[in-house]
């Protein structure tokens, strides 16, 4: 069986909701995906499809780093989920790698996430890189990745996820 990673299509929305609900075992993240998409905050949404069935999903949304002088554009990764029976088989990693590659190719400079500190460093994320960013979620799970080396040099401020993240907590 081959897994294809592709851009989300309008006909995928209900299936993405189901994949996300199953992956997390609750509705919160599925509602977050719906709100990010519905509010125009989503910047990239990819699905993993196997034999005509969605088995995974990843979304990146707009975010801002509020500095003293200005706002610096960034992306937030998440949610990313894979249905339970296909977890641990590389689908999540493939989604993340493909999505990061697409974001880098389209000129994005910074991506931040809140995720497992033992998982995301393999993709280049680091809590240290997010060290000058303040957030209600600061800590070892709050990590950043620079698509452009030095993109976070001299950048300090409040990291703001898109508004639906506040409604999801």
Report residues per predicted region.
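Short amphipathic alpha-helix that is part of the acyltransferase structural core
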Residues: 1-33, 39-55, 74, 149-169
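Conserved acidic functional residues
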Residues: 8, 115-116
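Conserved acetyl-CoA-binding loop of GNAT-fold acetyltransferases
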Residues: 25, 108, 123-131
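Conserved catalytic-core motifs of GNAT/GCN5-like acyltransferases
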Residues: 62-65, 114, 126-148
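Conserved acetyl-CoA binding element of GNAT-fold acetyltransferases
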Residues: 71-84
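Conserved acetyl-CoA-binding loop-helix of GNAT-fold acetyltransferases
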Residues: 82, 88-101, 113
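Conserved GNAT acetyl-CoA-binding A-motif
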Residues: 100-115, 128
């Amino acid at each position: 069986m081959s897994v294809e990673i592709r851009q989300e299509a309008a006909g995928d929305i209900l299936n993405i909701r189901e994949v996300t609900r199953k992956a997390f075992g609750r509705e919160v993240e599925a509602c977050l995906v719906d709100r990010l998409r519905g509010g125009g905050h989503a910047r990239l949404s990819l699905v993993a499809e196997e034999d005509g069935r969605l088995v995974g999903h990843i979304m990146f949304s707009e975010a801002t780093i509020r500095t003293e002088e200005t706002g610096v554009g960034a992306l937030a990764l998440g949610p990313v989920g894979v249905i339970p029976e296909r977890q641990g088989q590389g689908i999540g990693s493939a989604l993340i790698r493909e999505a990061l590659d697409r974001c880098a190719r389209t000129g994005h400079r910074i991506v931040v996430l809140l995720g497992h500190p033992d998982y995301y460093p393999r993709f280049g994320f680091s809590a240290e890189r997010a060290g000058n960013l303040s957030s209600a979620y600061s800590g070892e799970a709050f990590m950043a990745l620079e698509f452009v080396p030095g993109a976070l040099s001299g950048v300090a401020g409040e990291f703001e996820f898109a508004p639906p993240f506040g409604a999801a907590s």
